[in-house]
From Swiss-Prot:
Topology term for the membrane: Multi-pass membrane protein
Effect of loss of the gene: Mutants show various developmental defects including reduced tail circulation, and smaller head, eye and body.
Native species: Danio rerio
GO molecular-function terms, A-Z: protein transmembrane transporter activity; protein-transporting ATPase activity
One GO term describing the cellular component: TIM23 mitochondrial import inner membrane translocase complex
Chief subcellular location: mitochondrion
Protein name according to UniProt: Mitochondrial import inner membrane translocase subunit Tim23
Keywords of the record: Developmental protein, Membrane, Mitochondrion, Mitochondrion inner membrane, Protein transport, Translocation, Transmembrane, Transmembrane helix, Transport
Amino acid sequence: MDNSTPPPGGFKGGLGSIFGGGTPEYSNTELSGVPLTGMSPLSPYLNVDPRYLIQDTDEFILPTGANKTRGRFELAFFTIGGCCITGAAFGTLNGLRMGLSETRDMPWSKPRNVQILNMVTRQGASWANTLGSVALLYSVFGVAIEKARGAEDDLNTVAAGTLTGMVFKSTGGLKGVARGGLIGLAMSGLYALYNNWDHLKGKSPSHY
């Protein structure tokens, strides 16, 4: 019996050798020396050029036709929640200050602690409700104006801020409406100016 192995450049046996269609066998050592001229190395798992997987900037997977910046509706949740948390934190500190001031003549006892705790709870809830209501009005007006105009720019911000101030102070009569509108116009105008400060200085603005 001949136990000799065929040479690396031989042909596969079987049906291929019978019909004369055998394919030559090459070892990995022989294939490793074959130059791949003009070809990029491919990932063995993805079968793509790995250079396409290296991104210099952040890229997000977006649906077709979607914007890379968040709209008014997406920002509304963050705005309302952030204002409620900010109002609660500010109200808590203000209530603690007021409670300590009003009970400074009382000795440290349970009645004083209860009074301070009541003041903290009341002020925190009041400020959270106030700022949350303002944020809700601002978000509703912003989304409505964006849908009506079909565009998202600083004009929407200023208009939404002005209308928010007018509605929030509408219980104070015409003077209250005018005062609230001016306050909303000033605050939204300052925010728009701050948001475009890099653009005014000649730099490319960053959108979030």
